[in-house]
Amino acid sequence: MLFRSYEVDKAKRSAQKHQKGRVVWLTGLSGSGKSTIANALETTLFANGAHSYVLDGDNLRLGLNMDLGFTPEDRAENVRRVSEVAKLMVDAGLIVITALVSPFAADRNRAKSIFEEGEFLEVFVNTPVEICQQRDPKGLYKKSAAGELPNFTGISQDYEAPVSPDLVLDGTASLEENIAKLIKIIL
């Protein structure tokens, strides 16, 4: 199969929106603040007239990825699907914000490889696991401690922190501080 090109291309779509389509890939442990940051970033971008969309891992598991579990293979497929959807949205000229644990470097690198240079910003939300356990917004750490969640990232499954991300956010810093850092590299 060959990719079919159309007259209205990525450059024209981006120009119409007065922005460069790209993906902001937020990665970090469960409870690190990815979804909170994604929500605040989209709100800020919207207020500034930017066209954006959040692809939240939890929401995607209610539909597109509902058939996937949390084995390393399923996590790889989750990242692959989300990166392909994000690529289509970047092609439409959108700023796509993903909020996914995406624990394995190989999967994140594979995701990055499908984008053009400068279109993929890997952002590590660096929050100590102890803080994530205290936050535990979905009760997952409690379930993991009770033995109800095998393959739980950061506890019974490794999280491979990015070695050289485009940006590291301190998950214990203020939301405003983290959004300011993101806006600086996006707009």
Predicted regions and their residues:
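Hydrophobic anchor at the beta1->P-loop junction of P-loop NTPases
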Residues: L26
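Phosphate-binding P-loop
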Residues: S14-G21
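The conserved Walker
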Residues: S30
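Conserved lysine of the Walker
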Residues: K34
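Short, small-residue-biased leader/transition segments that mark boundaries at the very start
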Residues: M1-L2
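Small-molecule kinase domains that catalyze NTP-dependent phosphoryl transfer to phosphate-bearing small molecules
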Residues: N126-V129, Q134-K181
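ATP-dependent NMP and nucleoside kinases share a basic, alpha-helical "lid"
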Residues: G63-F70, D74, E84-S144, N151
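Conserved substrate/cofactor phosphate-moiety recognition/catalytic segment
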Residues: N39-K87
